[in-house]
């Protein structure tokens, strides 16, 4: 795949040679199987995604606020090896892999959506908005394929990739407010808006709005993630994370309103100046097999929850920086999360520049606990 | 490479509190109404009581009650309440399902509800079932009334209304109190006090919601007192008890929803008891539903109710006359739920983000800094020429 790129042994990151990620010593492996991915960007990582295709050697891509996009591949030494990098002249707000993992869509804060072809290592602008592009998702439907982008310009746009390099817009949906988060699990798409409403779309035969749900959360929505039903076949609902340290689990077609609920998370254990501090929930991911979810927050912890049993499975120890984004591999074996400053305390709060990427083996941690009777 | 400003390590830290994160939040723990006795939390290893022990103890008690003579029937309910106290002491936390099953086993005995339908001590039984029904308190109390248990006990309706209010169904809470009046529950003062307290708390909630929306300018318009807006989907309005309305006995009581009428029919009409029974309970599906209702996880967020002093209610259901909020008091050894004479001292919470981010996302803020964002020092990306590639 990368043979034609001509990189060879050329240095990729910061002038240093390509090196494998650092594995923790054996003494720590028995206690903690986490390991760091070498070559994390120098600025906050906004998005991190595993490649969608289940492979023997999964790939990992991340986009950061300094416009850096990097791709790693899991090598034979069981570490992630840096493979490619691109520099975009704007913060990266979202990325989306194409289904065969050969290309990456990039949502940028400079109002453009780009396509990075990994084989040729070239980038093209494939869509534009009137405001920063907040989300991008590749829709691989039964009858069509397109790129869905959501923006702060209050529009949701769908782009055709067949006529490149021409930008072909297939559809545009005018929204009442800015797009803050979105997720796609065909045939369902959910879009969270700044007015705390969630638009639900049916993507079969084109996007069709099927529901407009008011969020159960009182504060700004920060992330959203779709989950499947108990048979793990079809999308059934979504989980919302807010800046108030609370997550809402919402079913789209709810038979019993009591199935929808919210729970608190990512709050300080001790009092700080007499107050319990509430942190933002920065990202939510569902385990593809178990159906459990992991939340990451500005408090530097990740927590794993079983939404069906409404119990918490695990909480990590606090990390020295906020956790900004996470993803679970399609095999369910790995959880990747990024550390970095998330701007929650403004520009002056950025006291620790840089970022870290940690891989955590999660197949056992996120397994639902058996019910005792 | 430059030296890292801090030493990052993935070594596991000693954080004992992490294991109990779930229990730290008061909404995730449903305490008993009167708190937990401190002795019950200081368990010795040899005194550990298991689920099987509790089941066996109840079976023995029920067998013993079967052999009681008729003259000792008044002791039967007291022994059951003693068993409940024992259970709450020995199996304080984490046995809500077992407790509900055992309580259901008690009330489902033949003739039990009919025998004690006027005994106010049954209020404790219903309260315990409601508290351990995984958030289905409304159904439990409704079932009690449908079986004509404590139909005329005003304290039951007050407790029922309070539990519904805790679930956030304020309109339904009002309906419960209306049902109390329709059923001629006594003493009426309890119903009046509960109603006043409910409206007071409702006003306080509205004021707090208004205070939290400081940036919004609400245009207030005055409306005629008789043109109050409806609340919720039903055509009901807030209860306003004018002196003239209270003394007027000729007007009919407000009607309920059809669903409520079908399930809970009043036994009193025009302030007089009906000459014959008008309610016949034949829906067996309800019984089967309630038998296993504790398996349905209806997670309802609870928050403290700062009740006004109401000795009538507390006196009917508890031996203590304290009318304050029950809240957790943490210490270095264990966490004890207790009733304090002073007001609650629960720590306040605040969001650890800048105020501007309540309305503006982090990414919007970063995008607004462009092109002067400190991260933007890179060159423009190269454009792709597909024609050249082909």
UniProtKB/Swiss-Prot annotation, chain A:
GO biological process terms held by the UniProt record: mRNA transport; protein transport; RNA export from nucleus; transcription-dependent tethering of RNA polymerase II gene DNA at nuclear periphery
UniProt keyword terms in alphabetical order: Acetylation, Cell projection, mRNA transport, Nuclear pore complex, Nucleus, Protein transport, Repeat, Synapse, Translocation, Transport, WD repeat
Recorded GO MF terms: RNA binding; ubiquitin binding
InterPro entries associated with the record: G-protein_beta_WD-40_rep, WD40/YVTN_repeat-like_dom_sf, WD40_repeat_CS, WD40_repeat_dom_sf, WD40_rpt
Domain of life: Eukaryota
Tissues of expression: Expressed along the ventral and dorsal nerve cords.
Gene Ontology terms: cellular component: axon; nuclear pore; synapse
Pfam families: WD40 (PF00400)
Spans of repeat WD: 40-82, 87-126, 128-169, 276-315
Keyword hit for Heme: no
Modified residues (N-acetylmethionine): 1
Record flagged with keyword Aminoacyl-tRNA synthetase: no
Primary localization: nucleus
Compartments where found: Nucleus, Nuclear pore complex; Nucleus; Cell projection, Axon; Synapse
Oligomer and partners: The nuclear pore complex (NPC) constitutes the exclusive means of nucleocytoplasmic transport. NPCs allow the passive diffusion of ions and small molecules and the active, nuclear transport receptor-mediated bidirectional transport of macromolecules such as proteins, RNAs, ribonucleoparticles (RNPs), and ribosomal subunits across the nuclear envelope. Interacts with rpm-1.
Protein purpose: Functions as a component of the nuclear pore complex (NPC). NPC components, collectively referred to as nucleoporins (NUPs), can play the role of both NPC structural components and of docking or interaction partners for transiently associated nuclear transport factors. It is specifically important for nuclear mRNA export. Has a role in neuronal development, where it acts downstream of rpm-1 to control axon termination and synapse formation in anterior lateral microtubule (ALM) and posterior lateral microtubule (PLM) mechanosensory neurons.
Family in the record: Belongs to the WD repeat rae1 family.
Stated name of the protein: mRNA export factor rae-1
Name of the encoding gene: rae-1
């Amino acid at each position: 795949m990368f043979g034609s790129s001509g990189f060879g042994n050329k240095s990729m990151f910061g002038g240093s040679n390509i090196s494998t990620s650092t594995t923790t010593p054996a003494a720590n492996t028995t206690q903690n199987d986490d390991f760091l991915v070498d070559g994390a960007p120098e600025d906050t990582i906004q998005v991190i995604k595993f490649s969608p295709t289940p492979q023997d050697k999964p790939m990992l891509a991340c986009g950061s606020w300094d416009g850096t996009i990097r791709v790693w591949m899991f090598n034979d030494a069981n570490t992630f090896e840096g493979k490619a990098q691109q520099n975009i002249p704007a913060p990266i707000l979202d990325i989306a892999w194409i289904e065969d993992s050969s290309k990456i869509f990039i949502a940028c804060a400079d109002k453009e959506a780009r396509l990075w072809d990994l084989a040729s290592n070239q980038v093209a602008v494939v869509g534009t908005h009137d405001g920063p592009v907040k989300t991008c998702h590749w829709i691989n439907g039964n009858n069509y394929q397109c790129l869905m982008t959501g923006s702060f310009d209050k529009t949701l746009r769908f782009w055709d990739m067949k006529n490149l390099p021409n930008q072909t817009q297939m559809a545009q949906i005018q929204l009442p407010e800015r797009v803050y988060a979105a997720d796609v699990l065909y045939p369902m798409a959910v879009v969270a808006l700044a007015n705390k409403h969630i638009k639900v779309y049916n993507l079969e035969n084109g996007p069709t709005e099927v529901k407009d749900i008011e969020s159960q959360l009182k504060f700004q929505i920060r992330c959203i993630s779709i989950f499947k039903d108990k048979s793990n076949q079809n999308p059934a609902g979504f989980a919302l994370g807010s800046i108030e340290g609370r997550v809402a689990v919402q079913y789209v077609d709810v038979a019993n309103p009591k199935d929808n609920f919210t729970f608190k998370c990512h709050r300080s254990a001790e009092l700080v100046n007499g107050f319990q501090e509430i942190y933002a929930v920065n990202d939510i991911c569902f385990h593809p097999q178990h159906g459990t979810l992991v939340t990451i927050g500005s408090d530097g912890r990740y927590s794993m929850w079983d939404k069906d049993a409404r119990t918490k499975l695990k909480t990590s120890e606090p990390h020295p920086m906020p956790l900004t984004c996470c993803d679970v591999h399609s095999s369910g074996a790995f959880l990747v999360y990024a550390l970095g400053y998330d701007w929650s305390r403004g520009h002056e709060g950025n006291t620790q520049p840089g970022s870290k990427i940690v891989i955590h083996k999660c197949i056992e941690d996120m397994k639902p606990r058996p019910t005792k009777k | 490479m430059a030296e890292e400003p801090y030493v990052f390590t993935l070594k596991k830290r000693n954080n004992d509190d992490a294991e109990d994160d779930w229990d730290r939040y008061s909404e995730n723990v449903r305490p008993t109404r009167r708190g937990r006795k401190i002795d019950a939390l200081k368990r010795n290893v040899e005194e550990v009581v298991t689920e099987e022990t509790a089941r066996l103890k109840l079976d023995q008690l029920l067998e013993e009650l079967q052999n009681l003579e008729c003259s000792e029937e008044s002791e039967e309910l007291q022994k059951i309440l003693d068993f409940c106290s024992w259970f709450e002491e020995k199996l304080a936390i984490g046995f809500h399902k077992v407790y509900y099953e055992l309580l259901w086993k008690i009330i489902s005995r033949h003739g039990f509800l009919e025998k004690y339908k006027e005994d106010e001590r049954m209020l404790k039984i219903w309260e315990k079932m409601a508290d351990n029904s995984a958030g289905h308190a409304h159904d439990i109390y409704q079932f009690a009334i449908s079986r004509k248990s404590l139909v005329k006990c005003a304290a039951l309706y007050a407790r029922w209304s309070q539990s519904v209010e805790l679930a956030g169904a304020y309109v339904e809470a009002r309906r419960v109190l209306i049902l109390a009046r329709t059923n001629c529950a006594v003493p009426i003062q309890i119903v009046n006090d509960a109603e006043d307290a409910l409206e007071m708390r409702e006003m306080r909630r509205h004021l707090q919601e208004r205070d939290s929306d400081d940036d919004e300018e609400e245009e207030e318009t005055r409306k005629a007192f008789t043109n109050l807006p409806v609340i919720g989907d039903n055509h009901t309005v807030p209860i306003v008890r004018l002196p003239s309305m209270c003394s007027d006995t000729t007007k009919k009581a407000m009607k309920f929803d059809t669903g409520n009428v079908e399930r809970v029919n009043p036994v009193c009409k025009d302030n007089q008891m009906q000459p014959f029974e008008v309610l016949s309970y034949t829906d067996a599906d309800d019984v089967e539903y309630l038998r296993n209702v504790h398996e349905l996880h209806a997670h309802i967020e609870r928050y403290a109710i700062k009740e006004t002093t109401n000795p009538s209610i507390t006196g009917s259901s508890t031996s203590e006359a304290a009318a304050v909020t029950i809240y957790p008091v943490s210490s270095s050894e264990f966490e004890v739920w207790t009733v304090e004479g002073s007001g609650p001292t629960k720590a306040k919470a605040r969001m650890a983000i800048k105020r501007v981010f309540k309305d503006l996302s982090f990414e919007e803020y970063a995008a607004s800094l462009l092109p002067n964002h400190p991260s933007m020092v890179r060159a423009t990306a190269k454009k792709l020429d597909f024609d050249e590639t082909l």
